[in-house]
């Protein structure tokens, strides 16, 4: 099976206000902590979405957060695995091995459940998954749970061998689709809908997974409880503050989300569907 990485992103990781050096111990609130959301969009759009939110949370909590984003979702997840960050927005840590790292869920967005999808342009001659056999199919990256692992598992289980192409994030994968370089895309239903709204594109959904909760806000066990609670309360209270709600609406609009979204409390128990996936997933995706 051919795998190739599309070089469509910046060659170096982008970090706002932080050093790239790993930290073995939790920093003080005065020094600040690193916050890494998974790359759901290109780097520029990620910054547009998250910078105002991070600035609000820092000011409201009194705990300085610095946005740290890699050029791809794989790079950003690597920051987590090497303990370079203390707060994350991710769904990449629910495999049995990664749960041992001790990250704690404290929130999520109250968006509708997300699903893995395999899509083609609305005018594509492809109408069934079986027609993808031997074709190139783009995914955001090997770490993307909803957009890669879930739909690719479906293809593997159905015996449909495709050539995997990684686009670095959802936007990159979809750009390859409309450039005619791949026949289909595996994706996150929320991100595909947002892309369709922003770019005025239409899709045909060939397959859709069971529902999963949106990505989780998580904190490392290395962060003192006082700081963890202050940051959590700032995130979870944003929608109750007119200034915070305005920032959330602006962020939603920047990525094509039409319904108002807020951060709400969540726990590790809310992500049981992710754990079930790993119990039966093809070995190469565990």
Locate the predicted segments by residue.
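Positively charged n-region of N-terminal signal peptides that target proteins for export
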Residues: 1-4
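Bacterial N-terminal signal peptides
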Residues: 7-20
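Extracytoplasmic small-molecule ligand-binding "clamshell" domains
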Residues: 26-93
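An extracytoplasmic/periplasmic, membrane-proximal ligand-sensing/linker region
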Residues: 30-37, 41-52, 219-286
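Short loop->beta-strand "edge-of-pocket" segments that line small-molecule binding or catalytic clefts
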Residues: 33-41, 130-147
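Short helices/loops that flank or line small-molecule/ion binding pockets
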Residues: 74-87, 100-101, 130, 171-186, ...
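Hydrophobic/proline-rich hinge and linker segments of small-molecule sensing/allosteric domains
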Residues: 105-128, 216-220
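Pocket-lining segment of extracytoplasmic ligand-binding domains
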Residues: 124, 135-233
């Amino acid at each position: 099976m051919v795998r190739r990485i599309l070089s469509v992103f910046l060659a170096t990781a982008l970090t706002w206000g932080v050093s790239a050096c790993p930290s073995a111990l939790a920093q003080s609130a005065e020094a600040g902590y690193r916050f890494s959301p998974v790359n759901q969009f290109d780097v520029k759009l990620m910054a547009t979405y998250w910078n105002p939110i991070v600035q609000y949370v820092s000011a409201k909590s009194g705990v300085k957060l610095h946005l740290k984003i890699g050029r791809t979702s794989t790079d950003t997840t690597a920051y987590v695995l090497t303990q370079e960050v203390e707060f994350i927005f991710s769904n990449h840590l629910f495999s049995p091995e990664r749960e041992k790292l001790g990250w704690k869920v404290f929130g999520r967005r109250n968006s509708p459940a997300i699903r893995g999808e395999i899509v083609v342009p609305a005018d594509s001659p492809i109408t069934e998954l079986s027609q993808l056999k031997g074709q190139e199919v783009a995914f955001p990256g090997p770490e993307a749970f909803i957009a890669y692992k879930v739909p690719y598992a479906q293809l593997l289980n159905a015996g449909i061998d495709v050539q995997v192409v990684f686009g670095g994030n959802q936007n990159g994968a979809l750009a390859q689709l409309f450039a005619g370089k791949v026949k289909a895309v595996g994706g996150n239903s929320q991100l595909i809908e947002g892309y369709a709204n922003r770019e005025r594109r239409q899709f045909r959904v060939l397959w859709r997974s069971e529902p999963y909760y949106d990505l989780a806000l998580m904190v490392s066990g290395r962060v003192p409880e006082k700081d963890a609670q202050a940051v959590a309360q700032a995130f979870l209270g944003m929608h109750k503050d007119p200034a915070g709600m305005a920032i959330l609406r602006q962020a939603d609009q920047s990525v094509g989300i039409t319904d108002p979204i807020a951060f709400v409390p969540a726990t590790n128990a809310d992500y049981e569907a992710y754990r079930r996936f790993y119990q039966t997933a093809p070995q190469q995706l565990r």
